[in-house]
């Protein structure tokens, strides 16, 4: 069958989508890019926050129209929304033929076969299962970077988060399996390996009785063809000395960490169910910058959490101003059904949430521009992402920029550069989140 595959949500969901694509293509199905030519449509959904839920519902409804019209013979819904609303989806949208839970994506071929035969198919395995590899994952990111999901689930149970009930308890993917995946990804042209999970820093605790992310990183550095290794989703309180040391020792590991802190008011952190205090956060950030002076730190914040006062907001603003994160994103709090935070007193009006978010982002723009300006004159290694249409310029990323969420380097040159290659670039200018540069005199290695 000709299959259109739509992947919504985070990079962890994308990793699942790529596994399903591998299973589908391995069983003779053809992947197509448009609804009009698709015999079947698969939607891997997200429902982490309200906007993501809305996008998932709208996408399902839109694709259901092709089922009604008769051009699409099978409509399959997978992922977090499928896990959360398993009964409601097929009851309210009868055009949906099959629904797969978060640990059941390995059944995608069976689901497609059942749907093609006119049967309604539901599969919801234990959410604490660890799905098997497809063995031939399809890289959809353009080929030069890819996401390696090193664990499933989460044990933190923050009061605003629904993920543990959708993705199960924390369980690490065995090291041997990850090394095999990394080697396969490298064989497909991946140069940058990006480690993701609901939380990466406690990798190994369930399998080996201790944190072993540093050991995994050291072994991944031996994979031929991989040039950069980047780690996302690190809980700040779980950063440990051996991890810092391996980042200092191994040249392939980007001096970059994503540390979602969510807030800086101790009162709000406690209400969120977070396991750090502001003082601990300051200590962790200070230590990282002392040990790895050129480290780039990214964080994410939630503004407008229930009970957040103007005083709490100002405390967060001051923290952002003092800590000067290199990269920062802000979400307005989104009440999620079934979470403790949903029923907490002191719900903040949407308009005020957005005002507070905008204030933080305005401050961060100033910080980001200042940090970018400080880079002028430096030579940085850049991974080329592609050419700017109609111009003698390319887009690339430095070690300090993760795909999709961070900035870009605009490289002005008449030379021919290839996507996925690396070039040394001299920084000549800065914008709020992006840099401008030109090829260094000796730009190739």
Regions found by a protein language model. Name each.
Residues 10, 204-221, 225, 271-275, ...:
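Radical SAM enzyme [4Fe-4S]-AdoMet core and its adjacent flexible, acidic
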Residues 74-76, 84, 89, 187-311, ...:
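Conserved SAM/AdoMet-binding glycine-rich loop
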Residues 93-94, 115-118, 211-213, 247-248, ...:
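Short, hinge-like loop/turn segments at secondary-structure boundaries
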Residues 1-203, 242, 253, 257, ...:
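Proteins enriched for Cys/Gly/acidic motifs involved in redox and nucleic-acid/cofactor modification
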Residues 243-244, 316, 411-413:
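Short beta-alpha junctions and helix-cap segments that line functional grooves
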Residues 343-445:
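Terminal RNA-binding accessory module
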Residues 197, 233, 261-263, 299-303, ...:
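Active-site proximal loops enriched in glycine and acidic residues that flank catalytic Cys/His/Asp
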Residues 178, 195, 231, 259, ...:
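Conserved, mostly hydrophobic/aromatic
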């Amino acid at each position: 069958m000709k299959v259109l595959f739509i992947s919504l949500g985070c990079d962890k969901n994308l990793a699942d989508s790529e596994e399903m694509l591998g299973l589908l293509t391995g069983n003779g199905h053809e992947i197509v890019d448009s609804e009009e030519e698709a015999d079947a449509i698969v939607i891997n959904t997200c429902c982490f926050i309200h906007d993501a839920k809305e996008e998932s519902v709208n996408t399902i409804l839109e694709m259901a129209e092709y089922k009604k019209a008769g051009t699409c013979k099978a409509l399959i819904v997978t992922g977090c929304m499928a896990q959360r609303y398993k009964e409601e989806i097929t009851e309210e949208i009868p055009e949906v033929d099959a629904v797969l839970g978060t640990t059941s994506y390995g059944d995608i071929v069976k689901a497609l076969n059942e749907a093609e035969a006119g049967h309604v198919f539901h599969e919801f395995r234990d959410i604490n299962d660890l799905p098997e590899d497809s063995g031939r994952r399809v890289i959809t990111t353009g080929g030069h970077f890819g996401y390696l999901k090193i664990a499933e689930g989460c044990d933190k149970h923050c009061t605003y988060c629904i993920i543990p009930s959708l993705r199960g308890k924390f369980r690490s993917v065995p090291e041997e399996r990850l090394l095999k995946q990394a080697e396969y990804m490298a064989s497909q042209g991946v140069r940058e390996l990006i480690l993701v999970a609901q939380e990466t820093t406690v990798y190994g605790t369930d399998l080996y009785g201790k944190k072993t992310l540093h050991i995994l990183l050291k072994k991944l550095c031996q994979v031929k063809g991989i040039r950069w290794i980047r780690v996302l989703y690190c809980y700040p309180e779980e950063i440990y000395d051996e991890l810092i040391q391996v980042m200092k020792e191994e040249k392939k590991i980007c001096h970059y960490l994503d540390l979602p802190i969510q807030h800086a008011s101790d009162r709000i952190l406690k209400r969120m169910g977070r396991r750090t205090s502001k003082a601990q956060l300051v200590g962790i950030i200070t230590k990282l910058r002392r040990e790895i002076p050129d480290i780039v730190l990214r964080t994410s914040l939630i503004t407008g959490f229930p009970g957040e006062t103007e005083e709490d907001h100002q405390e967060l603003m001051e923290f952002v101003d003092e800590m000067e994160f290199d990269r920062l994103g802000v979400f307005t709090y989104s009440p999620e059904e079934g979470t403790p935070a949903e029923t907490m007193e002191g719900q903040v009006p949407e308009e005020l949430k957005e005002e507070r978010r905008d204030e933080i982002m305005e401050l961060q723009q100033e910080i980001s521009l200042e940090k970018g300006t400080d880079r002028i004159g430096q030579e940085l290694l850049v991974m080329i992402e592609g050419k700017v249409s109609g111009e003698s310029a390319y887009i690339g990323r430095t070690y300090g920029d993760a795909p999709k969420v961070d900035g870009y380097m605009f490289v002005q040159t008449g030379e021919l550069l290839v996507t996925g290659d690396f070039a040394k670039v001299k920084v000549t200018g800065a914008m709020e989140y992006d840099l401008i540069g030109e090829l260094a005199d000796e730009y190739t290695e």
